[in-house]
Amino acid sequence: MTTYLEDLTEGLKIETERRVVTAGDIDAFVELSGDRNALHTDDGYARSAGFAGRIAHGLLVLSLESGLSSEADEWAIGAYLEESRRFVEPVLPGDEIHSVSEITRVRRSRSKPDRGIVTLHVETRNQREEIVLEGTDVVMVGARGDA
């Protein structure tokens, strides 16, 4: 079912499915991004830097969050206008992540009255419910009718 601006209210929470981050995911992101930093490719180096082993790229975790979120809702339009994140804790192979978003603002667009602007606070958490990534999204959402 498609969700429109009129269906969304401040305080509404949206939780995604869960997904395990694998070593293969990290390896694929190394190849895709070209980011071969040893924190992502070498367990020994990552341990010497104070981590439990190699860690996922922050942008990999953000990309996975985006994919999980896109499957959690069917918003009309749903185009990102702004996105900001803070990388809080490392994600290691075998960690299971999911995201919880809370709508903090809903308003009709002034320039496009057939659309609205929705602001969300987003937290991506691991299997221990520790926040690993958090921030804000601003998205454009279709409305059912004119203002």
Set out the residue ranges of the language-model regions:
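Short, intrinsically disordered/low-complexity patches at protein termini
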Residues: 38-40, 79-80, 85-87, 117, ...
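Mid-chain, well-packed structural core segment of small domains
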Residues: 74-95, 99
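Conserved hydrophobic positions within beta-strands
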Residues: 65, 87, 101-103
